Amino acid sequence: MAGAKVAVLKTRPETVIEDYKKLLHMAEYQKFLPKDTRICLKINVSWQIFYPGCSTTPWQLDGVIKTLLEDGYKKENLYGCHNRTVVVDGKIGEVNNKQKQIVVGKYGLENVHLQPEKLSEFKKLVEQGEWIRYEPRGQLLTLHEVFPEGLYIPKRFIGESILHFPTMKTHVFTTMTGAMKNAFGALLHHERHWAHATIHETLVDLLTIQKEIFKGIFAVMDGTFAGDGAGPRAMIPYEKDYILASGDMVAIDAVAAHMMGFDPMSLTFIRLAHEKGLGCGEFKEIEIVGEDVSQVNWHFKDTDNFASRGQKMIYHGLLKPFEKTLLRTRIVPWAYLASRGYYDGVWYPLVGKKRVRQMMQTKWGRLFQEYA
């Protein structure tokens, strides 16, 4: 797609807030985010436990919100946004990851959780008109089949803008995850795991929908910490010191994928989005301003762990014939408990906790500890 631009900067803790301001201006963000509409700050919480590289960083929010306010965006038009998942508690996660402390504590912004604590109360939101059935104008690849009874999205999003806050990390289902995947946790309700079997097509459908309902779309990606391996949780974190921004969700993911060591067009969701004209997935066709990252290659690998292998058996393997029984009936809580039990009860105490302690000794770990 002609005109795709991604801004990339190297940063350090002493300058990261001002570097985010510089980054946003380099990416010409005001062209993508009108000042006369509300802006959903779509925060990423991939785990309620703090784990480096996993979720939106406090300095990412701090630098962007500060810039928005300094550039004349009205405080009342900005709000932090979270969505409920069946395996991650967003309300605990936004505190442990020091996100709420920035959004509410430092800047006093509205902070919205799109779904109630009790998942059984979701039907009330539909009855009250807070979540509405949406019929996309564009052709969808998979979501009509995933949700045959109707596709529901938050009503409040229609006519607003969205600003995504992903991090640079790998993912067991999509190889890498970034701006396009961040919408997965915004537009779909708590049963969005049903879409994992066709996750690549789902991300393309979600970008199609975003372009229909939002007045503006922009993404700011933090790669100060970056995660390699069986993401988005069970990763090996590294200090990488990069931040990225763009109004093209496909292009920013393509640049991030290239930096991690993946061929962007080999990733199905990037290729499909590029082919549909939703953005630019060809690295050589993207205008990169700031750092020259053409030779950057972190040699990240898309790997699996015990939990993800089990999930893939359900979505793509021997257990595929039983997918609906296992994930769409009354016995489904077994899957949530198994996931939480593995990641929270086994992997983190035995593996993850040590890695967090090591990362807390780094410059970004020390900065994280400085945030109250």
Residue ranges and their predicted role:
Residues 1-372:
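N-terminal and secondary-structure boundary signal
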